[in-house]
Structure formats: structure tokens, C-alpha cells
Amino acid sequence: MTTNKTAKIQFYEGTDEPVVPEIRLTRSKDGTTGQALFLFEKPQALSSITDGEITGMRMIDSEGEILTREVKVKFVDGEPIFLEAVYIWKNTPDFDRFMRFANSYAKSNGLGYSEKK
């Protein structure tokens, strides 16, 4: 099921993930490289109603799609509870593009952004 949000995340093509993740960013000292860690607790993508294999995480907005294949499932007491995805950028244009997605995703989901001091 696709929503009318301007920015969304999908693990299965055409199916928006309704669970909003915790997102943590880290960057190199010069700011050119870094990563975004997405942590989804009990995402719909792991529920029994979803079928198929998760092959990546798609970040979709009005500019297009950013894809990462770095996706892991974390189990607690034998149950899949967390989905963890990592997006790595290797240059400033990739970081700028990611931040435009992140800002759009935040607005679509009523979220804010704060820097660690």
C-alpha cells in the first residue's frame, strides 16, 4: 500500500513502511563521508502479513530514490523485532542528497532534527 506522503521508505517495492525509524548520522571530520543508521522497531516489513525477501531499503521522495542493500534483522528471544539499515555516503553530493530526503521524510512524518552537542 502506497501513501500520499512526499517522502517514504519501502522494503518491498510499492509497499510503504508505516513504522518511523530512529535515525542516527555520523560523518567524517571533513564531512565528505559518513553513514545514516536506521533502526525500525517492530516494522510492518517483518510482520506475518508481508511476503517475500527484503533485498534493500528504498528512500523515495520527489527527487527519486536512494537505495541501500545494507539491511539486517535483529532477533529477540527468537522473534524478529528490529530492522537495521545503513546508508553510506562517500562524497558531499551524496550527503546533500540524503539530507534533502531526510528533511522531506521528517516533514512527511511530523519529525524534527537535532544535533548532538
UniProtKB/Swiss-Prot annotation:
GO aspect biological process, one term: photosynthesis
Name of the molecule in the record: Photosystem II reaction center Psb28 protein
HAMAP family cross-referenced by the UniProt entry: PSII_Psb28
Gene name of the encoded protein: psb28
Record keywords, A-Z: Membrane, Photosynthesis, Photosystem II, Thylakoid
Organism: Prochlorococcus marinus (strain MIT 9301)
Ribosomal protein listed as a keyword: no
Gene Ontology CC terms, in alphabetical order: photosystem II oxygen evolving complex; plasma membrane-derived thylakoid membrane
Top-rank taxon: Bacteria
